[in-house]
Amino acid sequence: MNLKQKWDVYSRLTRLDRPIGTLLLMWPCLMALMLAAGGMPDLKVLIIFIIGVVIMRACGCIINDYADRDLDSFVERTKSRPLASGEISTKEALILFVVLGLSAFGLVLLLNGLVVKLSVVGIILTIIYPFTKRITNMPQMFLGVVWSWSIPMAYAAQTGEVPMEAWWLFAANWFWTVAYDTMYAMVDRDDDLKVGIKSTAILFGKYDRQIIGLFQIAALVCFIAAGWSAERGLLYGLGLLTFVGFSTYQQMLIFGRERAPCFKAFLNNNWAGLALFVGLGADYLI
């Protein structure tokens, strides 16, 4: 395997070729940094978190594919992943995971002690998550915690503490993550039932759209509470209104429960997150 082929394998293993996950992680993290700083966060902290999100997203993908390597080959969407297809060995994948994980931890060591402690919890959660799909019907709810963990870390890095405002944002992102990852799980539901992978899409069954809607509403309420705590104004409100518009569109897409529209609904959440981020940023700038 030449260098170009190796890069292609690593890129697919870490999902660098599919940045949607990184973006969905990035928007709430950047919002947390802005809210914690009351506007523009410290440049050093901002750079560390941007790089850290990219690295930890890659780590999460590697450990997820490692855990699912014997099942992914039976799922249409995942059968061509490098570990499932045998393009890379488990040893090489785990070495890459360790290297990236240590790199992320090295960045965290440039910040305060509270962030370091929270980061240890974060890496443990990241490792545990992929295995929850075998023992619980609600792995998306665990993923919501994993994908929201950068929020208390961001507040800790910027202010040295984690106030109630941070937990409102944490709750908002948790509800939102469960909603959009259930849409994602709807894409694989038929294959998951065959191989024994558990998900909220399977758990919710025929009530999936309604429950996703409830989670979207709960996310909105918590985003409002976070903004209220930070005394945000009209432009943040416009961002929230746009978020509602995207959520409504997603409900339309998943109405028929077909694979392609459900995946499109999942991808659309990137724009919902961007709308929230832009609304918050504009509210501080103008």
UniProtKB/Swiss-Prot annotation:
GO terms for cellular component: plasma membrane. Its cofactor is Mg(2+). GO terms for biological process: ubiquinone biosynthetic process. It is found in: Cell inner membrane. PROSITE patterns: UBIA. It is an enzyme of class 2 (transferase). Its EC number is 2.5.1.39. GO terms for molecular function: 4-hydroxybenzoate polyprenyltransferase activity. This is 4-hydroxybenzoate octaprenyltransferase. It comes from Shewanella sp. (strain W3-18-1). The lineage of its organism: Bacteria, Pseudomonadati, Pseudomonadota, Gammaproteobacteria, Alteromonadales.
